């Protein structure tokens, strides 16, 4: 008898997709690129890039994945013909190398999580102290490998539990928790001295930046980093959505969720720094 394939619920799919999208491109890269490209001008350009590039591409990927019920390679083969199968292999290879990169960063995050719980981070630490802590960690090959292995093992365990019992269950808890943490940090940042200057710097639209081609190029690049559009992740996730799932609505909700992340994170960094 054919085994019934697991499916995401609507909320579970959106949470899992946001979990896929939200990463270093959102939390680390966006604030830096935003500050370097005019603050408010960049946010306008990025918002337009999300609407005309990222969300439509995500919708296309989701539609193809939902239609073919195949992985990245099979989807490119069936959608474009055998001569385009190599594109699927290329996208899959890119994802593999991205995984290698993110696994290392995941280990770093695991180490810092342990430091936070064990009170290694004390109030008013100097830059020299935090730099020394970072150097001591990265110079210790045993620690780097250990935390990398722990993070990778946890990820494998969650995936092994399946769609409903693993990925969806975890993301339904982790994604709301992430939003609460980031919004809480943004609210805290607003209470600090100099908050008004930080907000003005972040959200003032400067004409020279809004008219600069580089601002728009960086905005479209950031839209790809922000969402994973074109990386094949959504093609795979769409294998596990129900036939009744509304593709444009799901992708639009993802875009709105990412927008909240992007606005709260640079706000926090601009005010705290």
Predicted regions and their residues:
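Extracellular loop-to-transmembrane helix junctions
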Residues: 5, 34-60, 143-144
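Transmembrane helix-boundary motif of multi-pass solute transporters/channels
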Residues: 12-48, 232-241, 249-252, 256-259
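Hydrophobic, small-residue-rich membrane helices and short re-entrant helix-turn-helix hairpins
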Residues: 158-176, 198, 211-216, 229-261
């Amino acid at each position: 008898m054919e085994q019934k394939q697991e499916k995401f619920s609507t909320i579970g799919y959106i949470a899992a997709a946001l979990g896929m999208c939200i990463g270093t491109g959102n939390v680390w890269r966006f604030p830096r690129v935003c500050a370097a490209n005019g603050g408010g001008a960049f946010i306008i350009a990025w918002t337009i890039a999300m609407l005309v590039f990222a969300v439509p591409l995500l919708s296309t990927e989701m539609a193809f994945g939902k239609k073919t019920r195949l992985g990245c390679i099979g989807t490119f083969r069936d959608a474009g013909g055998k001569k385009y199968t190599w594109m699927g292999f290329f996208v899959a290879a890119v994802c593999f190398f991205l995984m290698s990169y993110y696994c290392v960063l995941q280990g770093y995050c695991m180490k810092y999580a342990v430091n936070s719980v064990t009170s290694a981070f004390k109030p008013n630490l100097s830059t020299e102290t935090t730099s020394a802590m970072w150097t001591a960690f990265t110079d210790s090959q045993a620690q780097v490998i250990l935390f990398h292995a722990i993070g990778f093992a946890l990820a494998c365990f969650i995936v092994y539990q399946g769609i409903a019992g693993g990925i969806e269950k975890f993301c339904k808890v982790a994604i709301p928790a992430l939003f609460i943490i980031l919004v809480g940090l943004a609210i805290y940042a607003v209470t600090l001295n100099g908050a008004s200057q930080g907000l003005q710097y972040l959200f003032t639209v400067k004409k020279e930046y809004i008219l600069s081609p580089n601002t728009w190029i960086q905005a479209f690049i950031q839209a790809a980093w922000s969402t994973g559009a074109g990386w094949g992740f959504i093609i795979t996730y769409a294998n596990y959505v129900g036939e009744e799932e509304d593709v444009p609505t799901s992708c639009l909700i993802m875009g709105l969720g990412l927008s909240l992340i992007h606005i709260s994170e640079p706000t926090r960094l601009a005010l705290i720094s």
